[in-house]
């Protein structure tokens, strides 16, 4: 009986931890919405990031509460960049142009799992 209690307790604790982790991560829909105005510059169609791009990314940066959030944002951006034709030579310039510190290299080649 004692073993069953501890097994159930462990399982519930584990599930609660998973729920907290998944709630903490920034959803891709939010990332896509906030970064949408940056696509023109990131694909080379616009000569500089728009003010809407910078505002969206600043708002996105304010949602970051943890390393898991940074990793989630990185994964979302990488996934979107493949389908949108994002070019690294433009993408990497966005943080400086928008005066945003992201804490990791902005590139389609970034290994999101190494972000800390």
Swiss-Prot record:
Keywords: Disulfide bond, Lipid-binding, Signal, Transport. PROSITE patterns: PLANT_LTP. The keyword ATP-binding does not apply. Residues 1-24 form the signal peptide. The keyword Transcription does not apply. Pfam families: Tryp_alpha_amyl. It comes from the Eukaryota. One of its GO terms (biological process) is lipid transport. One of its GO terms (molecular function) is lipid binding. Disulfide bonds join 28-76, 38-53, 54-98, 74-112. Belongs to the plant LTP family. PANTHER family: NON-SPECIFIC LIPID-TRANSFER PROTEIN 2-RELATED (PTHR33076). Plant non-specific lipid-transfer proteins transfer phospholipids as well as galactolipids across membranes. May play a role in wax or cutin deposition in the cell walls of expanding epidermal cells and certain secretory tissues. This is Non-specific lipid-transfer protein D, cotyledon-specific isoform. It comes from Ricinus communis (Castor bean).
